[in-house]
Regions:
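Walker A/P-loop NTP-binding active-site region of P-loop NTPases
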Residues: 18-58
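Glycine-centered loop/turn motifs
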Residues: 68, 94, 174-179
Length: 215
């Protein structure tokens, strides 16, 4: 099974409590956080994100340049500020982006779409999460090379994802299991639960502690 590389886009969807955030953090802990900055948009103030060891909090108008994990907490009324920061990321290039929750970016954010459509050439890897994919910008799905799909409670959400993922999402998997779709290989794999959040946080701590010693 392939994992996304430094230029790929990954969409992770699932209902609240399905395991998507833990899976997304596992993916992030495996990415190149020791070689580039990753900006995490924590719209929902998720505690598992805010508890990442060695992460740094930044304001919505900051643009980190050194490797590591940087968390920002946009308010619902800061869509213009989010767009401005995303344009700065697009212009700078070489910065990873993690968005939780995807639909809170806004349905018509041109900077977000630019990163999705041009992220590969500009080396902007992206991880986007959503509990309601039917509300999310369709460019997230059309441009993603990898999908991870957990339990979705709403039929409209399942149908929305099935337009891009060749799996019968009405067939419920065991708790915390997911469908993993590699678009390039046109291959669907059923994944077991990812490691515990404690194990994931330890991996962050190990990797980020090492780069803090060199910065």
């Amino acid at each position: 099974m392939r994992l996304p590389d430094e230029t790929k886009r990954l969409a992770i969807v699932g209902a609240t409590g399905s395991g998507k955030t833990q899976a997304a953090l596992w993916h992030l802990s495996m990415r190149d956080i020791d070689r580039r900055p990753w900006i995490v948009y924590n719209f929902k103030d998720d505690r598992s994100i805010d508890s990442i060891p060695q992460k740094r909090d930044i304001e919505i108008d900051e643009l980190p340049l050194k490797p590591g994990v940087y968390v920002t907490h946009p308010q619902p009324n800061q869509t213009d500020e989010v767009e401005a920061q995303m344009w700065a990321i697009w212009e700078k290039q070489g910065i990873g982006v993690y968005v939780d929750e995807g639909y809170m970016v806004g349905p018509n954010n041109p900077a977000f779409r630019a990163m999705l459509t041009q992220g590969r050439s500009r080396e902007i890897p992206i991880i986007v999460l959503s509990q309601r994919p039917v509300w999310m910008d369709r460019f997230v799905f059309s441009e993603s090379e990898f999908f991870q799909v957990f339990r979705l409670n709403h039929k409209r959400d399942r149908k929305s994802v099935e337009e891009f993922v060749p799996a019968d999402l009405s067939q419920r998997l065991p708790d915390y299991h997911s469908y993993y779709y590699d678009v390039g290989e046109n291959k669907v794999t059923i994944l077991k639960p990812v490691p515990s959040i404690q194990q994931i946080h330890r991996r962050f701590d190990q990797r980020l502690s090492a780069i803090r010693k060199t910065i």
